[in-house]
């Protein structure tokens, strides 16, 4: 679309039992949004022939510890740069060592109260990455993990990719929907101020949460 960088190899899957992925980019329960870069330099866009955004694999695990063997097989087959998992069902009693994958850094946001929920993210060690925390308060009713990615090569003028992995519970209400909408808008504004020309990937299990504002106000596009 107009020479904008694309996000190939993005798989979105929700409500899967057992763990699995689909070749279809979007299905019910899984979405990935990528910011339009707005770059107009034709030379830099032509160079996109030798550049690809990191590939992203998204799945809803419903207890990842019970499906690690399946996860290892999928990772070996797909070789995605980034693996995003919702409903990880991990808690503070679960050490990272139990769910590590070779050649990937692991990041997680566990549910603080009650069973279920939680998000988990694996990033290839070939990509510099670390957790970032926006100075914006978030409701404990949803889990969201922010990770900054600095691939070795990015098309100009992008300086980094801000990845968000989000899980919205199915019982969310109008009040929570408004709070989440406000939170995402504030976080994107925060990161745009903090970093020069960041690109964004927001993915996860949104359930019935309406993401239209991402397209209308933030100029994201659904992949």
Task: Please provide the spans of the model-predicted regions.
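A shared catalytic/ligand-binding motif for oxyanion handling
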Residues: 1-223
